[in-house]
């Protein structure tokens, strides 16, 4: 359920972020190219990277643009992956997650004519970088609400892969939804 909600949110955000691009696509002689750089885990991680890629694939089909991805096995791959897409003249390069912020900033500063976007980071203040931020607590509220309604034990929980601001927001939303649905519930974290 969470994966489907995240895929829908990412798809909508990516489509919205590139919705102003049809004019650019129509004016270009070459096909508009969008590249996605994953965090570690790759496009088959069953989580954030995969949802981002699936959303971008859908956006590519709907907008008629070329999409591709490069997987990062380690953080040492971030910068070389950026350089690959820049060297191949990609029009928009999307970084999946705040862990790619430094590499995105460096690539954007060195390539001011290339457009970049980064998911879940708003620390880069450059004219060629767009931050794609989501309200994780809103989607997780719905998941928590459903969990609160369907539990048979009044005892539920959730696990996050790491502790950061986005995961904390997810947890707050999940707990709020569960408690609103079932005031007698206990939420394990």
Predicted feature descriptions by range:
Residues 27-189:
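A residue-level marker of the well-folded mature domains of exported/periplasmic proteins
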Residues 1-32:
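Short, low-complexity disordered leader/linker segments with a strong preference
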């Amino acid at each position: 359920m969470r994966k489907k909600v995240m895929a829908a949110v990412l798809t909508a955000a990516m489509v919205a972020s590139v919705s102003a691009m049809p004019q650019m696509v129509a004016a270009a002689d070459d096909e508009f190219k969008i590249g996605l750089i994953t965090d570690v885990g790759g496009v088959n991680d069953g989580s954030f990277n995969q949802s981002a890629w699936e959303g971008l694939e859908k956006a590519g089909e709907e907008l008629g643009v070329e999409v591709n991805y490069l997987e990062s096995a380690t953080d040492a791959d971030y910068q070389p992956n950026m350089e690959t897409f820049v060297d191949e003249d990609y029009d928009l390069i999307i970084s999946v997650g705040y862990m790619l912020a430094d590499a995105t900033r460096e690539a954007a500063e060195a390539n001011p004519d290339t457009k970049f976007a980064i998911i879940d980071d708003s620390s880069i203040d450059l004219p060629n970088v767009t931050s794609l931020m989501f309200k994780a607590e809103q989607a997780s509220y719905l998941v928590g609400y459903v969990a609160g309604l369907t539990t048979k034990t009044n005892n539920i929980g959730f696990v996050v892969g790491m502790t950061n601001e986005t995961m904390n927001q997810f947890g707050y939303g999940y707990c709020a939804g569960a408690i609103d649905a079932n005031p007698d519930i206990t939420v394990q974290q």
